[in-house]
């Protein structure tokens, strides 16, 4: 390699490695100077002196440079240091959480004889809701009055999940008896049974645009069923533990599932395999909640709630969820409020965008119940987002609403202490 080609190589390497920098490291300058002749180095020195004399200053004493100041401090002063952490902190501080009105208990509904495990609100008229329980029954309640409308019997074990169709008069239920049942809400009878699951079914959901339902449970497999033919059209295997929750979307990823193997999987329904596996959680992931106003969702495990961007599964926010204990349920409304309920009976309300917990309540066990039976097992907001329904171990359903007339001055909420922890992977 001749001298000319060597010089071209050095210049190209300097441009690629240091072209974006406003200063060049001293060791690089020394190597460059060592290759220059005496006359060229003298000319460079004269040019630097001429530029220094052209700098105008109002100071009375000529600045001769810092002598005893460490080099890293000089770089910070000159703005040459890596300020990524500082920039991130300033970004966190600038994103102040939105104020939300506090919530209070307004109604307690009793009727089940076992733990209430699931709840779903009428997606059409927002006039009634259904609950499933350990007593193997499904009960339909009037949302305005809290009165029982009908009791559906057909399962022989715990009813773990319910979903209601917005296009057809059907309701689907999943149970520990290995069955998924389709209920005709006009006749209040079972019209279809979906057989084939090898163990208890923990979750069921209806596809928003296709005549398909998706179920998952203890056998660690997600199954896709054709409603009309009652046949299993697709089996999605990949989880290494029982699946706690499965949810459907009208676009990719059309299926999202979470499991006791501490993972969340985003499934490609056409390819029949996971698009993405989220492994950020360290423990059993118990529930998922989609944001109704943006394309993202939240997931929860013990002492850890995170939100994710779809489609790529990018981590958005680490919620301020320390010391929450086991989180059993999540729910999100249109106002950006994320609710979390767990085994300890604590009800936590978060600002979805910033992850700030603005209110903390504690549910009260019903008279005659044990203190350990005040845990929250399931929850959902109604279609307006103004009422929260919680299902609890004390066999009750509780309805929560905003405090009337609350303002930011009268109810400021819990203090906001921003940190970089919520953005950490």
UniProtKB/Swiss-Prot annotation:
It comes from the Eukaryota. It is found in: Cytoplasm; Nucleus. One of its GO terms (cellular component) is catalytic step 2 spliceosome. Associated with the spliceosome. This is Pre-mRNA-splicing factor PRP46. It comes from Eremothecium gossypii (strain ATCC 10895 / CBS 109.51 / FGSC 9923 / NRRL Y-1056) (Yeast). WD repeats lie at residues 111-151, 154-193, 196-235, 238-279, 281-320, 322-360, 371-410. Belongs to the WD repeat PRL1/PRL2 family. SUPFAM superfamilies: WD40 repeat-like. Keywords: Cytoplasm, mRNA processing, mRNA splicing, Nucleus, Repeat, Spliceosome, WD repeat. The keyword RNA-binding does not apply. PROSITE patterns: WD_REPEATS_1, WD_REPEATS_2, WD_REPEATS_REGION. PANTHER family: PLEIOTROPIC REGULATOR 1, WD40 REPEAT PROTEINPRL1/PRL2-RELATED.
């Amino acid at each position: 390699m001749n001298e000319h080609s060597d010089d071209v190589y050095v210049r190209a390497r300097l441009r690629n490695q240091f072209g974006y920098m406003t200063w060049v490291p001293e060791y690089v300058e020394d190597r460059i100077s060592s290759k220059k002749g005496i006359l060229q180095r003298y000319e460079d020195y004269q040019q630097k002196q001429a530029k220094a004399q052209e700098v105008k200053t109002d100071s009375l004493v000529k600045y001769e440079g810092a002598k005893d100041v460490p080099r890293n401090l000089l770089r910070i002063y000159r703005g040459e240091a890596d300020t990524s952490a500082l920039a991130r902190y300033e970004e966190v501080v600038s994103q102040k959480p939105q104020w939300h009105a506090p919530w209070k208990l307004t109604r307690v509904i009793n009727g089940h004889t076992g733990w209430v495990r699931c709840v779903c609100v009428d997606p059409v008229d927002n006039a009634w809701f259904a609950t499933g329980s350990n007593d193997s029954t499904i009960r339909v309640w009037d949302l305005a009055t809290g009165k029982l409308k009908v009791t559906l019997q057909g399962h022989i074990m715990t009813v773990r999940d319910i979903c209601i169709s917005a296009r057809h008069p059907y309701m689907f239920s999943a149970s520990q008896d290995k069955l998924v049942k389709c209920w005709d809400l006009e006749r209040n009878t079972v019209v279809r049974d979906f057989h084939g699951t090898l163990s208890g079914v923990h979750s069921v959901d209806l596809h928003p645009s296709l005549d398909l339902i998706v179920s998952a449970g203890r056998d660690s497999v997600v199954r896709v069923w054709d409603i009309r033919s009652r046949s299993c059209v697709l089996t999605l295997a990949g989880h290494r533990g029982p699946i706690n929750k499965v949810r459907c979307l009208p676009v990719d990823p059309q299926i999202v599932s979470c499991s006791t193997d501490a993972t969340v999987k985003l499934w490609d329904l056409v390819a029949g395999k996971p698009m993405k596996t989220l492994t950020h959680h360290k423990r059993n992931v118990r529930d998922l909640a989609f944001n109704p106003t943006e394309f993202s969702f939240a997931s929860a495990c013990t002492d850890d709630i995170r939100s994710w961007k779809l489609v790529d599964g990018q981590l958005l926010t680490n919620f301020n969820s320390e010391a929450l204990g086991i989180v059993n349920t999540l729910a999100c409304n249109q106002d950006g409020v994320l609710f979390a309920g767990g085994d300890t009976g604590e009800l936590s309300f978060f600002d979805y965008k910033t992850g700030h917990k603005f209110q903390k309540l504690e549910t009260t066990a019903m008279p005659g119940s044990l203190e350990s039976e005040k845990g929250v097992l399931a929850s959902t907001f109604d279609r307006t987002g103004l009422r929260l329904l919680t299902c609890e171990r004390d066999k009750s359903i509780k309805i929560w609403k905003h405090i009337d007339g609350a303002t930011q001055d009268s109810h400021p909420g819990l203090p906001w202490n921003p940190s970089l922890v919520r953005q950490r992977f």
